[in-house]
A protein has these predicted regions:
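Extracellular glycan-interaction surfaces
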Residues: 64-102, 109-112, 118-130, 145-217, ...
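Extracellular glycan-interaction patches encoded by glycine-rich segments
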Residues: 23, 213, 220-250
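Self-processing/autoproteolytic domain segments and adjacent N-terminal interaction modules in large
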Residues: 276-376
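Short, surface-exposed loop/turn motifs with a glycine/proline- and acidic-biased composition
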Residues: 495-519, 588-619
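C-terminal tail/sorting-segment detector
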Residues: 4, 527-545, 586, 598, ...
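GGW-centered surface loops in extracellular recognition modules
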Residues: 23-72, 242-311, 381-386
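Short, compositionally biased serine/threonine- and acidic-rich segments at solvent-exposed termini, linkers
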Residues: 438-548, 569
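Proteolytic cleavage junctions
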Residues: 399-446
Length: 629
């Protein structure tokens, strides 16, 4: 089965018995019981109702909740959908909201409670209304309400002062407005956080205090959450990259870990007194990805078991003292062993991906030692693994190389596909680590798709190439094409090698793309019938008007006008071929008949077709999509 280059299948059961259960929420804090909403623009943004991944510039219809609660944010009205923009913030995508279009999204069915912890990563381009809204939480059906008494929680920015503020409404109906304290600059991203605690509602900007108000800890229902709007018409004008909500007030150690995860991911610097993770800095290698951590402020504010969205789980620190943290992230290297030569003697391969650790005090000013820790790797999707072959590789001298190290043995299967090394003492501030194997045959490393590209050729065709690093029980690939990201058809089905541990290249041609924008995606099918879709690629084909065909409309319900330069007096053979290459319609017409009339294809089944028009040994080809009437 295939895993794309920059992701890894994670299948672990989360049980809420804090802190003993795996913490798979943002930064490795919480799980679906407490982390009740989690929207990241790098995960699950669709241009339709959850089927077609959005491409840059496309409108976002659905934004999937990755908390596990299924509270997906949606916008059914096409005119009010924000744009998905790739690579906009530290290489990560954002949703771009336009206030003039009243762009907004709505998440419903959130398991709310009387306490809450909320984060938003955002920036504004302008503040066109008195208080443009980032979030508005309310009871079912009230998330877009302009009635102040129904806005049970929220976060917005004053256009008069550019300061962030918000509110919470208690169950007795008392509205508690957070005082304004911190101004936000135009076009500058921030990590914004509101804590709804037992005795106060407090806001933070990049972890620094940004206003507070007394409260009795009885926040009213916020089962619905408006994103990008408040008060119905006060819309956000700018980018939102991530939204996180907990139905508890997380402790101070957890709050710092979550904020550190967001700051590293989006390339922001926290206030100097709280920058506990340094490995995201360019000079230290940009270990920005899937950051998670453990830490302790005091005995009532600690977090000792974390995993987050990555495959690494660290727990059970033996010497974690007050005001101490261990935070880690990775370099986004491939989860595969091909082409990696930096291994110690006796190790046959290692992950290209490496992790790096910060062990710092709570103010980020000095190194600390949290003691020995347990380090586990979830190898779901790897296939058979013999734990005796696994080696934890630690760059203990911090010289950037693993070849001069000795791998740590002793891995054992905990459950499922989770393999753990207990009481590891080699990890310290700034140290890198990764996972290796002494037998690539018996314990391989994961399957990955290395690349998938689509490029136009000089003769207005499209060449599609993809490369795999390894394959396990792979049956075939299907290349699919669409003119509109809604109607997809097969360009080609290609038999796969099946099982391989070397680089394998594949290539097909699309002989008849549309003039203009074309969308392509790759579908992989296992021998057991399981399928996986890989990200969409786009190609623009210029229309020269001579040797290609255009159809109006396209897609069509069956009545089609052909646009092409043809000899009006010559006889032309018009043929329509389905995806299997079978001719389903043919007739002879003069050029004048062809250009003046309408082809009636209403009796042809819906699907993707190639039309050939031949005359005097010359052939013109075009792609036509027929829809059900």
């Amino acid at each position: 089965m295939f895993t794309p280059r920059h992701s890894f299948a994670l299948v672990v059961t989360s049980i809420f018995v804090m802190p003993l259960a795996a913490q798979t929420g943002p930064g490795g804090v919480g799980n679906s019981t407490t982390n009740v909403l989690w929207l990241g623009a790098d995960h699950g943004v669709f241009s339709d109702a959850g089927l077609t991944p959005a491409v840059s510039g496309a409108n976002a219809w659905q934004w999937n909740d990755r908390s596990g609660n299924g509270s997906n944010a949606m916008q059914a009205m096409a005119a009010q959908r924000p744009n998905y923009i790739s690579g906009a913030l530290n290489g990560k995508p954002v949703l771009r909201f336009t206030a003039a279009n009243t762009d907004r999204m709505l998440a419903t069915g959130i398991p709310s409670a009387n306490r809450a912890s909320v984060w938003v990563v955002a920036r504004y381009s302008s503040l066109p209304s008195p208080n443009p809204g980032l979030l508005q939480g309310a009871a079912t059906g009230d998330a877009y309400s302009a009635t102040p008494a129904l806005k049970n929680m929220g976060m917005w920015v004053s256009s008069a002062t550019t300061q962030v503020w918000g509110r919470g409404i208690q169950t007795d109906g008392t509205s508690r407005n957070v005082t304004m304290a911190t101004a936000l600059a135009t076009a500058t991203p921030y990590v914004l956080n509101t804590m709804y605690r037992q005795s106060a509602i407090s806001q933070y900007v990049n972890h620094g205090p940004a206003g507070s108000v007394a409260s009795n800890g009885t926040l009213r229902s916020w089962t619905d959450m408006a994103i990008g709007a408040q008060a119905g018409t006060e819309n956000w004008n700018g980018d939102i990259a991530e939204v996180i909500a907990f139905n508890v007030d997380v402790n101070e150690a957890q709050r710092l870990i979550i904020t550190s995860y967001l700051a590293a991911k989006y390339g922001m610097t926290l206030t100097a007194s709280t920058d506990v993770y340094r490995e995201d800095q360019p000079a230290r290698g940009n270990y920005d990805h899937e950051v998670a951590g453990i830490g302790r402020i005091n005995s009532g504010n600690l977090h000792t078991d974390a995993r987050g969205t990555g495959i690494v789980r660290i727990s059970n620190p033996t010497g974690l003292g007050n005001n101490e943290f261990m935070i880690w992230g990775h370099d986004n290297g491939v989860l595969g062993a091909w082409g990696v030569g930096d291994v110690p003697s006796g190790v046959e391969g290692r992950f290209q991906r490496t992790w790096r650790v910060s062990e710092r005090n709570g103010s980020g000013t000095s190194s600390v030692d949290v003691g020995a820790v347990d380090i586990a790797f979830d190898l779901t999707g790897l296939g058979p693994v013999d734990p005796a072959h696994l080696r934890l590789l630690v760059d203990s001298d911090n010289d950037g190389s693993f070849s001069d190290e000795t791998g740590v043995e002793g891995a054992y299967l905990v459950s499922g596909a989770l393999y753990r090394f207990d009481a590891v003492t080699l990890i310290s501030d700034g140290i890198r680590f990764t996972l290796g194997t002494t037998d690539l045959g018996a314990t391989p490393l994961p399957v990955e798709l290395v690349s998938f590209t689509a490029e136009p050729t000089s003769d207005a065709q499209v060449r599609l190439d993809w490369v795999t690093a390894t394959e396990v029980d792979n049956d075939r690939f299907i290349v699919e094409h669409s003119p509109d990201m809604e109607h997809w058809s097969s360009v080609a089905s290609v038999d796969a090698v099946g099982n391989s541990t070397t680089l394998i290249s594949y290539s097909v041609m699309d002989p008849a793309p549309f003039a203009g924008l074309n969308y392509y995606r790759l579908r992989q099918v296992d021998v057991n019938g399981m399928e996986e879709l890989f990200p969409v690629r786009t190609v623009t084909i210029e229309q020269d008007g001579r040797d290609r065909l255009l159809f109006q409309p396209n897609p069509s319900s069956g009545l089609v006008k052909v646009q092409a330069l043809v000899d009006p007096f010559a006889t032309h053979l018009v043929s329509l071929f389905d995806g299997m290459g079978r001719c389903v319609h043919t007739r002879s017409m003069t050029g004048s008949e062809l250009m003046a009339g309408t082809l009636d294809l209403t009796k042809v089944p819906p699907g993707a077709y190639l039309m050939h028009i031949e005359c005097d040994g010359q052939r013109r080809t075009g792609r036509l999509q027929l829809l059900t009437e």
